[in-house]
């Protein structure tokens, strides 16, 4: 069974990068499974079948959460951004923008490399055009 998840030759990638890619793929698969269960639950009328599917969906969410936690532990900048967004009240997008700005400014002030930054710099271009 072939699984092409790399955009660069796999044998040239360090093990840490390959593990990171595997967890990204796993996170995606878990998210898809959660969505599939949600669709099944939306159309299933049998209560016992729904209970089984709901339980299975919960397992997928647990796996999704563990994959996400692994990735956030390996990428401190992402973790800092996520902490400003997750479990917060109010506007999600606003929290996201503020959190990203604070995290990247903080990393720059600390002299930390911004490798792995989620920003493409497009927001800066939008502000410059204003």
Regions found by a protein language model. Name each.
Residues 1-130:
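Iron-associated oxidoreductase/ferritin-like identity signal
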């Amino acid at each position: 069974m072939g699984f092409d998840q790399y955009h660069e030759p796999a044998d040239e990638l360090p093990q840490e990068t390959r593990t990171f890619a595997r967890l990204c793929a796993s996170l995606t698969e878990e998210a898809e499974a959660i969505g599939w269960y949600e669709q099944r639950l939306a159309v299933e009328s049998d209560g016992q079948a729904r209970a089984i599917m709901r339980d299975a969906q919960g397992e997928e969410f647990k796996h999704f959460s563990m994959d996400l936690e692994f990735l956030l532990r390996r990428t401190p900048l992402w973790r800092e951004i996520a902490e400003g967004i997750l479990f917060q009240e109010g506007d999600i997008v606003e929290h996201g923008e503020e959190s990203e700005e604070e995290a990247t400014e903080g990393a720059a002030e600390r002299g930390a490399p911004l490798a792995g930054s989620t920003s493409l710099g497009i927001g800066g271009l939008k502000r410059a055009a204003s």
